[in-house]
Amino acid sequence: MTRSMSLLLMLASLCAGASLAAAQEADADFDMFEEEFAEESVTISDPLRGLNRIMFNLNDKVYFSIIKPVAQKYKQVTPRAARISMRNFFHNLAAPGRFANCVLQGKGKGANTEFKRFMVNSTVGILGFADPATEKMGLEATREDLGQTLATYGFGNGFYIVWPVFGPSTLRDSIGRAGDILTNPLVYVNRSDAFLTLALAKSANEYSFRLGDYEALKMDTLDPYVVMRDAYIQFRNQQISE
């Protein structure tokens, strides 16, 4: 498989959580996602609605036919403790990006927290497989990304777009995600086979914690596309306002 294809898979893996939440906070964020969505309505430019609906339906089929079965099997054969360690490892690798975005947003406290977390978890936490920064020191990770940074500099959402596999986004967040990828060390793994293995491992591991979230969001709604779109925009607005 070519490195360009591997990069696409890696991007999908890294963005899978980003569409709804950063990896380590995925479960808690989803609960907040639902609560916040119920409280207020949101507006978003959606000039690509026809194409977006096609992509949404495609992603729906990919999820139920490929992603969910793989994640279920992975969950069955991998102990929860191992999956948590894997999640910690990948989350720790993304710390430099969160640190940079804290700096760019002028959030000194957040930058200091991310720096300390990375140093502690990379050493005491054995390359990030453990999270003593949270468990022993009470240093909770931030959730900053380049999309939020662009928003603080006055960039609006732009139009809504649903990417194949990657899922819901906006013009601003799409640009932001591309930048976030460049700060992740996994992108710079030279061997394509190792790169692809890490990408698929991250994706399967993350989805193993999120089984049922998508189904819950779709439940009892006549138009899941609109629900997903509005919930995503409101969730991102909430993140930016923090």
Residue ranges of predicted features:
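Positively charged n-region of N-terminal signal peptides that target proteins for export
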Residues: M1-S4
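N-terminal targeting leaders of membrane proteins
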Residues: L20-G108, K136, V187, L196-E242
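Bacterial N-terminal signal peptides
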Residues: S6-G17
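C-terminal transmembrane beta-barrel domains of outer membrane proteins
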Residues: S192-D193
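Alpha-helical transmembrane segments of helical membrane proteins, especially in multi-pass transport
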Residues: W163-G176, I181-N184
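Mid-length scaffold segments of soluble, non-membrane domains
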Residues: N88-P168
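Solvent-exposed loop/turn segments at secondary-structure junctions
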Residues: K61, F129, G167-T170, Q234
